[in-house]
Amino acid sequence: MSFQRIVCLTEETVETLYLLGQEHRIVGVTGYAIRPARVRQEKPRVGAFTSADLEKIKALTPDLVLTFSDLQAEIAAGLIRAGIEVHAFNHRSVAGILQMIRTLGALTQCTDQAEALAAGYEARLTALRATAHPHRPRVFFEEWDDPIISGIRWVSELIEIAGGQDIFPELAAEPLAKNRILLPDAIPPRAPEVILASWCGKKVVPARIAARPGWQDVPAIRAGRIHEIKSPLILQPGPAALTDGLDAILAALWGPAA
C-alpha cells in the first residue's frame, strides 16, 4: 500500500520525505519542522513533539500518521482509537536512521530513491570511519545542562565516526534521557578535550559550562574548545544528523576544512 495523505509528527520524517521527492504526500507536520526551510510555508502545523491537535489531524483526513517512540504513545493511542493508521519509529542509532529512510521509501513506494539516499550516506560514513587520525580526541557531548545529560546513541556513534572518542560510551545505549543524567563531578575525571553541547533548542552558553566548579582544569575548558551544535542538526535521528550534524562535529574536532 502506498500512503497518499501523511501527517509527520517528527522532524526527521518530514525532511526524509522531502529528500525522497514525496513532499506532495505530506498534509501536516510537527510545529518543529524546519528542514527544508520551505516546509514552514507549505505545510500546516498540527502540534509539538509531545502534544498534538487530534481534531486538526483528523480534519486533514490522513491515511497515515508517523510518530516516534513511547514519547508520542498517548498521541498515537488517540489516533488509533480514531481509526487512523499509525507507524511509530523507534530508532536511536545510525543504523536505525538508515533503516528509517528505507522504511519510508517502502511506505511511499519509492524504494529505489530511498536506497540511493541511504546508500549515499553509508558510503560517506564508511569513508570517514576509514580515515586515519594520529590522535582521537576525547569528547563530551552535553544534551542538556540542568541536569547534565550525556549524548544519545546516534550522537555517540557520529562522534566515533568523525574520529573522536565519546567519554561516556557506556551511557550512549540508554534510550531514555533520565538514564544519562550525570553529576557535574563525573566529567572532569574523564578529561574531555572537546565539549560539544546541544541543549534541546536552548542557546548554549559556553561561559556557563567553563565556570562550573571543579571544571577549570578540564582540557577542553583550558583550550577553549566548547562548541555548540544546533539541536535541529544533531538531536533529530534523521538526515540532518548524518549531514550537517556530522559536519559540525567534524569542524569542532578538526577545523572548518574537515
What residue spans do the PLM features occupy?
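N-terminal ligand-binding lobe of clamshell/alpha-beta domains
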Residues: 1-258
